[in-house]
Design a protein with these regions (language model features):
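Conserved N-terminal phosphate-binding loop of PLP-dependent enzymes in the Aspartate aminotransferase
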Residues: 1-250
Length: 250
């Protein structure tokens, strides 16, 4: 890339982990050019063949049985929260609505997402606190276990933390998280919005652990430079998302 003064840069930022195939990729150019001569947009109220194709690829190659598409990463994490809460509501347990997150994590810039992040820097000046979130210290298993209550619906954690410092959740820790969630009968949400889509060497950063989460929000690299997010989920938790419980224009 070149600045306005002609200075040359190697782009390792990649639009903050978005341009997974770089700039002006031939494959993306051909795909965009082909689609631009067809239907542009009809909303998710209709069947979209290319969207179905992507959903099938995602479910075929991941743990997921269902996919809900969004516009961005923060919408994907907000939708993940809705999926978790709605699941327990559909099971007659509406009191199980709290999401347990890591202090100083990052799950997006919308209102619920910033309070999920548990960071004063993120929430300062944005009015009344959004309820429904509890927090524990990264790597502190006693803090984690102590924070789980009969109102906890899910644990949501970045597989590799971004804003809070590049902290990798070890594979053994992911396995323990899965065991804890199974024992407490709560859901495991692994936020792969920034660390996913090949950035760790695998499609998802959690793959080497062999852990199967219940819900995974993704975005950034999946669009190759275009705004797209998605929530991946298993059949069990998807059962709560009936017609009309969620939607997205794009």
């Amino acid at each position: 890339l070149y600045s306005s003064s002609g200075k040359k840069y190697l782009d390792f930022v990649q639009g903050i982990a978005v341009n997974s195939l770089g700039h002006s990729n031939d494959y993306l150019i051909r795909a965009i050019n082909k689609q631009s001569k067809k239907v542009w947009h009809v909303s998710n109220a209709f069947v979209i063949p290319e969207q179905e194709k992507l959903a099938k690829k995602l479910t075929k190659n991941t743990f997921a049985d269902f996919v809900m598409f969004q516009n961005s990463g923060t919408e994907a994490t907000e939708a993940a929260i809705k999926v978790a809460r709605r699941y327990f509501y559909s099971k007659g347990k509406p009191q199980k609505n709290r999401i347990l997150c890591v202090k100083n994590s990052f799950h997006g810039r919308t209102l619920a997402a910033i309070f999920a992040s548990g960071s004063k820097k993120m929430t300062e000046g944005f009015g009344p606190k959004v309820q429904g979130f509890d927090h524990f210290e990264f790597g502190n298993h006693k803090s984690l276990k102590k924070s789980i209550t009969n109102k906890t619906a899910a644990i949501m954690i970045e597989t590799i933390m971004g804003e809070g410092g590049i902290k990798v959740v070890p594979n053994w820790c992911l396995k323990e998280l899965r065991k804890i969630c199974n024992k407490k009968k709560i859901l495991l949400i692994l936020d792969e919005v920034q660390c996913g889509i090949g950035r760790s060497g695998d499609f998802f950063a959690f793959e080497k652990s062999k852990v199967k989460p219940d819900i995974v929000p993704i975005a950034k690299g999946i669009g190759g430079g275009f705004p797209i997010g998605a929530v991946l989920m298993n059949k069990k938790v998807a059962s709560g998302m009936t017609a009309g419980t969620h939607g997205s224009t794009f």
